Amino acid sequence: MNPSDIETIELLSPAAPAQAPRPLFILLHDAGAAAVDMLELGRLLGDAFAESAGLLPQGLTGSAADGESLAALAGRVEALAAYVRLQQQRFGVLQSDTALAGLGAGSTLALALGGAHDGLVGRVLAFGGGYAVWPAAAPALTTLHLLHGADDSVASVARIRADFAHLMELGADATLDVVSSAGHGLHPAVMDQAVTRLQTCVPLRFWKSL
C-alpha cells in the first residue's frame, strides 16, 4: 500500500499555519466503517485546537475487526507508520506534535503502532477498543488515552480495564476514562473527555525531563 495513494479527508483550519500545524490529528475509523464517520470528532478537535490539522484516512483499518491474524495486523501497523511519516514530513510536524486517534478496530491499530513505533506519535487516543495483544513493554515517548463507554457491547469495559491495569504494571504514561450511559462509538461525552485530556494532561516524559 503506497501511503501517498490513501484516500484522505483533510480538515485544515484557516487559522492553522501552512507548515507545522499543532497538533496534527490522524483519525482512524472502525472496521467496516468509513473515514466520514470520524468527521464529528475531527471537527470538535479542530474547534478546540485552532492551529491543528486533521486527517481522516480511508481503509487503513481494514474491513474486519475480529479474526484478523497478528501478521495481518502487523502489516497494517507498518502501512500506518508509513502514512504517518509521510504526513509529518508533508506538514513539517514533529512526532511529539502528532496525535493518533482510533475508534474500535482503529484504536486497536493505533495502540499497536504505539507499541511497535514508540515516539512516532506523541499521543494515542483509543475510543471503544483495546489491545489485540498486550505489549511486553510500555512506550516511553507516547502517551496513551483509553476512552470507553460503560455500556459498550462490542468491546467490554472489563477488557479495557484489564488493558489499563497491564499498562500500569508496565509503568506506562496512560489514562483511562469510562463514561456512564455511553455505548460503542463516539459519544459526545467521550469526545469531550478526549479534548479535556489533550488540553490538561501533560505527558509524563516532560515531567521526567525537568
Role assignments for model-derived ranges:
Residues 96-141:
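Primarily recognizes the serine-hydrolase "nucleophile elbow" in alpha/beta-hydrolase
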Residues 22, 96, 139-144, 170-173:
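Short, proline-enriched alpha-helix->beta-strand connector loops that line the catalytic pocket
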Residues 145-148, 152:
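Short beta-strand/loop motif that positions the catalytic acidic residue
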Residues 2-93:
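Serine-hydrolase catalytic machinery in alpha/beta-hydrolase-like enzymes
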Residues 158-210:
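C-terminal catalytic histidine-bearing segment of alpha/beta-hydrolase fold enzymes
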Residues 58-62, 130, 182:
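Short beta-to-alpha linker loops that shape the active-site pocket of alpha/beta-hydrolase fold enzymes
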